[in-house]
Amino acid sequence: MKKFLSVALTALCFTSTAEAVYEAKSDTGTEIFDYIENRRREAREQKLTEEQEKLLADIAEAKERLPQEPKEGDPVPAVFEGDDMVYYSGSGEFIATGKVDIIQLDGYRFQSERAEGNVKEQVVRVEDKAHVLQLTPGAPRVTLDGYKTVYNYGKKTGTMGNAHGKAGEYYLTGKRFEFYPDHIVVYDGTQTKCGAKTPDYHLSAERMEIWPEQVIRMYNVKFWIKNRIVGTKEYEENQLGEKEKNHFPRVGYNSDHGAYIRDTIEIPIANHLSLDINAYVETKKGVRSNAELKYKNRDFRGWLKYGFYDDSDNRWIQKEPSLDLWYGRHFGKGIPLSYSVEAEVGHWRQRAISSTHQEYEVKLMHDPIILGKYALILNTGYKITKDNAKNVPNGETTVRGSNYSVILAREFDERFAAYVSFSYDKNNSRNSVFNFDVDDYSKKFQSGVSYWLTPKDRIVVGVKWNADQDKFDDIDYYWYHDLHCSQSIVRWRGKRKKLEVRWEFTPW
């Protein structure tokens, strides 16, 4: 099972929203490579482009040429350049033509072939194409190309028509952009993380808002695959840097269940409250879906769950229903630790076994300890599991015990990574009523390697060792292949001789 890895990856999620986990489905601990790949991807996204580096260099040079330092409260200085400039000192009007370049020293660049405006009013007007670059601390990095632009660089307000560009990792288009000091509004816009000229998927919205706290808010949203609408929603909110959201269907095949399709439909009910329909249909056993009434507010989560759930071994459980409450947070103030408390109580069913099931767990997780190319991840916890099954011998059970894991991962280079781990969990299939999300033993070693064969192809091998009985337990082989803006994953369960193939749009 992947229980101990989920604890470790929860710790990674506490450290940064940019490290939210895009999980591989693994039984041998290979999820740690998702953390490594997400971190590499984040580093690439945070790297400045050539034009962003040039803007910072030009700002630094312009500041050196200022006759005096601006006082607090003074307008932010701007620098104007062009092949030909005409300035009317009386009115403040100007006309600039040929490689017009306007830099505002707090991180803005405005470029066009012709611009008019008024220096006294601090207004720039461009009828034809204009290029805008925003690189201000704490705000999303924005690059836009559009038409019929009017911009007041003093008030930081303006408009742009028929524009396209990028905010953070999102590619945007819009019929009209409005600029305000603290946010950007897009009307009749689209957004996607797919950088293709014709993206495989995108979201459209009547109105989008891009806020400095790295948030995109969208209203009256449609979800598209190519040119077909696959869903609608009144409101959607994305965090820039978020990797875990995937709005689109996932399809696949495995030896146990045949071909299948998964999709998640989120229905907003009230502030912080939604109904999630996790739809799942397979060819062998039909519909196995679930529904969750979800509450999410800051560090607290709550779910009322009903339906079918599967683990990494394709074992299924029915929750009829189950209430799951979770609270977790980072200690902060220089303390590299996070903690969480979780309780789940409900009626569970697995084949002929049914029980009132209770789980209570507290976890303590250390932030990843980075030692050069090594990452050390430590966590521990204590869990109480109670069952009261009436239809099986010894169905009334209580299991109390600790769990912990130690994971050491190394990035040898941009292509090659490896890990080794040891974990202990008191809960296992021998002392549990339900054979779900637990191993057959308590102590295990896991290790694996990941290697990029080509820029689009990665192979992963993960192995698991039963340390209770000192015997080899499992081996998984993976082939990840990047397709445009989606990914296919082939998994071969070496010891079990089982195949699984998945295809899904990538959430980055």
Predicted features and spans:
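Long, low-hydrophobicity, solvent-exposed regions enriched in small/turn-prone and acidic residues
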Residues: 2-5, 19-125, 130-143, 153-508
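Bacterial N-terminal signal peptides
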Residues: 7-15
